[in-house]
A protein has these predicted regions:
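Structured core elements
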Residues: 34-37, 44, 65-67, 75-76
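Acidic, glycine-enriched catalytic cores built around paired aspartates
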Residues: 5, 9-18, 39, 50, ...
């Protein structure tokens, strides 16, 4: 949900760092930590291959345990039949085993420096286009079916957190649902181009691709 506030790249990196800190605290206090992931059907809300998602978690944070919820729109796609359900659950179990037994490489400090810079630039670009642009709300209302979706009352919670009509009050689910209806998944990529471009300018030796 935090990707709605700062963009997917910045939100993902912040979540990664937070998971690392939680793991350190749990290890220090000898607590078994189980991280909960509320995965979305859309890429903008965490959707995507389960295998790559679990294998991209910080080393040691899966540790044989995880808790995941699937969004309602993907239940039929993954669990409609016994064979589908068996395959989906098998993917989860296998991914947890692999992430536990063969965890990913711990990020080097220079990798973290790159990600910190990319996260900063991405968040700034995202905010300048969405939160700071006075014309964006009008654009959003005109190009997406959000105004009509609000009248359907199809969600389990209100569309907005308050009576305000600004972007901040809109919940993440209707935000993504509106973009998905027009096949324009802006929240999944906005700000990433600026982050990559900035990184290529800063880290030019030996190769921007190697740094990234």
């Amino acid at each position: 949900d935090s990707s709605k506030d700062v963009g997917k790249l910045s939100a993902s990196w912040a979540q990664y760092c937070a998971q690392e800190e939680l793991q350190k605290l749990s290890d220090k206090n000898k607590i078994e930590l189980t991280l909960f992931h509320g995965r979305g059907g859309s890429v903008g809300r965490g959707g995507g291959p389960v295998y790559t998602a679990l294998l991209s978690q910080p080393p040691g944070t899966v540790n044989g345990r995880t808790r995941i919820t699937e969004q309602g729109e993907v239940i039929q796609q993954k669990y409609d039949t016994a064979s589908l359900a068996e395959n989906s659950l098998g993917t989860y179990i296998g991914s947890v085993f692999e992430a536990t037994l063969i965890p990913p490489v711990k990020p080097k400090q220079k990798w973290r420096n790159v990600m910190d810079e990319m996260s900063k630039v991405s968040a700034q670009a995202y905010h300048s286009n969405i939160m700071d642009d006075q014309n964006f709300l009008r654009y959003f209302d005109e190009v997406t079916p959000q105004k009509n979706l609000e009248k359907l009352f199809i969600g389990s919670r209100p569309t907005r957190r308050s009576a305000s009509k600004d972007i901040k009050s809109l919940r993440a689910i209707p935000w993504m649902f509106a973009w998905t209806q027009m096949r324009f998944i802006l929240p999944a990529w906005l700000g990433i181009l600026e982050a990559l471009s900035d990184t290529c300018l800063l880290y030019t030796s030996p190769s921007p691709r190697d740094s990234i």
